[in-house]
Amino acid sequence: MKNLIFILLITITSCNMENKDVLITIKTPYGDMKAILFEETPLHKKNFIDLTKQGQFNSTIFHRVMKDFMIQGGDVNLKGDPNAIDYTIPSEFNDKFFHSKGALAAARQPDNVNPKKESSGCQFYIVDGQVFSRDELTIDIQALYQGVQLLFQEEEYKDLRNEFIQVQNNRDETKKLALQYKDIVDEKYGIKTSMDIVPEKLDAYSNVGGSPHLDGEYTVFGRIVEGIDIIDKIAAVKTGQGNKPIEDVPMTISLEMVKKNFISKNYGYQYPNK
């Protein structure tokens, strides 16, 4: 009978754990941020949880801060710990997750020394980014400019060069003028000036903002779900050489177990079916 009760208790505990997930809290002098970690990136998720449980992130700093781009931290090796973290994590790219504002992603070494785009074992960044117009997200402006330069050579567009010269010091006006000739460039030279982008990305980058050029280059493994304004505050601090804040911005990271349906209901993350 005792064995049966023991087995039932283990089963109940196991079921309860399966119905729960971690909710991350990142404490900073500017306020707290809460984050969720995606199950679709299991290697990065496990690594982040393990380091958090070990207290590795505590007393680390945001060592690289770039306004309208991202805030980077988590380099536990800067603490001078003799047990340096020098391993990498295989990339876990997923089209569902992209670099909209608040995305939690893994930093990494550049392609020339890291062609597989493997992630740092500890460093991460949180996207600040900027809001883009729909034209910026759906039109290859460089391809369009190349097409316009071809038009300069056409007799019927001989006055076009002068029009561009008049607005050359105004980036927005230059772009606006070029857009008027998009259809002509497409048809006349067969240049593809349109870019494909899924509706979810288009809506996110044109409303909340982000850093779309990072998509497919770095693994996004989580998202800030509370304290988005803290990203702006940290991104706005004064920085010195190497984009390092003049005054340290330390952090401590902790986790708590909450029900998965709480995360889905409050933060909109839908867990994958197993």
Question: Which residues fall in each region the model found?
Answer:
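Sec-dependent N-terminal signal peptides
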Residues: 3-13
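Cyclophilin-like peptidyl-prolyl cis-trans isomerases
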Residues: 15-274
